[in-house]
């Protein structure tokens, strides 16, 4: 993918643009330079235009190569811009006795020193807060999202952190030369001078830039002259084309030379025509047969389409050309066309490489992990109360002093008491008064500590938490460690101004099966208009990684509930951000509203609304997403309900767990699925199947040898079908087998969650029944908790204890409950295999969110449209005799430590044995299952044989050192769902040690 350049230079097309610097208009045809910033209202970059001189007052480009379109400027303007960029001074060195240049004074303004006005700013060295009244130092930068949009962003530093980073920040002078130094107190001035002494000139880094001027060798001098001559000839033609030729004649000239005219951009059309007259006609693209090439940096890029989803973007440095042929009638009309040469020539370009930071930003934007963490540059020990929240009850005369002491120790003072308050500073007298705030503190279990607590912490900076317990003066208090806020790690996405303050998922009010978008403000007085088979509500999407687009567009025709009044509501923007806008239009009649709705649909998709069932994707247009909004009132909270459940407590807790809406939402968020545009359960099963097919297609492309154009095409389709939240980062190209496996697992989870959601939707909330009992009835599975004192429980516990592998020691497994499982119809389905020899009780693990689907439909084999990745022995149902091997598939963590596992009776019969991966499409006639033999296994001589002949391989593990196998542990695979009879469900607690 092409590097996204931060600036754009061109000649003003009209005289209407206003300079963002001086606020005056920019005259037509004068050179103007733009900062390309993200629009707050559309999923696109927009130019903030400046006069040339105003631009350099507001921005500090590091390289002329960061300026898009510079190669299409006049030679003199290229030269001037290069000189201006080169003259920007980025470092401040000691200039004793020297007259300071304008560039030096401009650079000096980017630095400053002062006392922190609050405790809100963050040091960009150590990423810790800078407390109020501490000395802080500023470097204003211009290459950040904020800096580019607002003409600079001040980045603050502690004095010690700035001193360590001074070289890369570009400050080599003494600290006393920094603006603001004189405003500091004498002792702070001394600290600054000591921390930031001047650096000798001979120790300065080489800051010279590569200049545009070439060295004086004959060859390079000739190249420079050729560049100038070509540029002059090019602009002679361009000026004549712009000032003299009619557009229809330009089109005739281009088409006569088999060049497809650029549409929608007159200036690019002039560029294309001038290039034709100066250098000759470019041959058609070998990839897509397009006849339209656009100048791009130091070459030409094909403007054709690989498919309706993807641009071709083939890049040519030196395209094959033929001589430009001018029709006689045009020569007669335009005299300058008689000067066109009859021999094609090669266009040479100046090499303007982008700055390293531009490369870096581009690499970060294309990083496969869009949550790349921002790590501190400077290690710094956190103050003892860092990020801990304190409050005060009473002690009114000492509030100001106590607040300052808390903040000096790194803590935060908050008037409001909350569950995140670590402790409250007060007195025994205030405890006896039992004020409302004190009672609330007792309810939350927050410790009350005296003022002396701060004395202890100031004397012993490592014992803050222990002093909360030891100095506590109240009779209550939960573990203070539980109230320590988790360290928040910043990511590239969270740093963006367009991903902060994102709205939480909203409740949709459903009327007649259709939801009114709450952003319309009409959800209480209107409903979605329905006309025969037409439901006038659509959600459109488009992901295009070549243009960094991840857009949505929603349109609804709404009718007032009580009168003849109609509205068209539409909203649009970038998925996962606050970029976007909306519009509400009122109509008097349904016909005018329908006409407007259909016009919008046709404009955005290129399809007529009446033909939506035969939808054809159009190049650059949007695609409908099948999202079905249902009544969110059915997503009840299980904590309290009017009707008492008839289920055992352990079964109630299990049903709560597997039907937990928050867990399902968290799972979708882990996969970066956009929860605003695609709330839980709203994506159709058909759309999920389509996504499976796209992922399988990507797998086939990789198997046949990676083809970037095909991968981009399929990636665009996948992310359009399944909206993902990439924030402002570039959507990730799907190009590895690991990504395919991750997406397959995501779609598996989506499919299972869709089952759970369908069950919830089908329930009648008006029933005089607890929702847990409703859920339980819907899964059609009997669950009975085993007595923990029974022999059956003891045998199964031994199976867990003995088969935990030595390579899986990051956690221990604690059994919370074991349930005997009887799925409706499964025993009957399994009956033919009950007579088969070699039946074992084996483990299977899966995500929590998959268990509604598993219990209601049984364990299933991946659908045909799913890619074959992740299946070592083909698509089947996988089991293990080592508990921890299956436990790893529960996808638990220290934060989400509850997992569910199954023990199933598996009819293995005659097994095809393998010691390495072998993809099996179909077993041979005399085999019933596949056995991947691992080197470590439960001791087969110690197995327990049940009365019905089923083997429980619960022996202690042994290792066969002589076996040549690539597998660590045994795997068992069956390819017929009828060979599985689920018998037990374990609720496990994963006790992580690290």
From Swiss-Prot:
Give the enzyme class.
transferase
| One GO location term (cellular component) | Cajal body
| Entry EC number(s) | 2.4.2.30, 2.4.2.-
Highest taxon, organism lineage:
Eukaryota
Gene that produces this protein: Parp
A biological process from GO: DNA damage response
Q: Which residues form the BRCT domain?
A: 380-471
Q: Where is the composition biased (Basic and acidic residues)?
A: 200-225
Q: Which region ranges are annotated with the description Automodification domain?
A: 368-507
**Family annotation (PANTHER family):** DNA LIGASE, POLY [ADP-RIBOSE] POLYMERASE 2
Name the positions where Zn(2+) 1 binds. Answer: 19, 22, 51, 54
User: What residues bind Zn(2+) 3, as annotated?
Assistant: 285, 288, 302, 312
Q: Which residues form the active site?
A: 971 (for poly [adp-ribose] polymerase activity)
**Organism, scientific name:** Drosophila melanogaster
InterPro entries reported for this sequence:
ARTD/PARP (IPR050800), BRCT_dom (IPR001357), BRCT_dom_sf (IPR036420), PADR1_C_dom_sf (IPR038650), PARP (IPR008288), PARP1-like_PADR1_N (IPR049296), PARP1-like_PADR1_Zn_ribbon (IPR012982), Poly(ADP-ribose)pol_cat_dom (IPR012317)
Residues recorded as binding Zn(2+) 2, renumbered to this chain, are 123, 126, 158, 161
Protein name (record): Poly [ADP-ribose] polymerase
| Pfam families from the UniProt entry | BRCT, PADR1_N, PARP, PARP_reg, WGR, zf-PARP, Zn_ribbon_PADR1
Q: Where is the PARP alpha-helical domain?
A: 644-761
Zinc finger extent (PARP-type): 7-89, 111-200
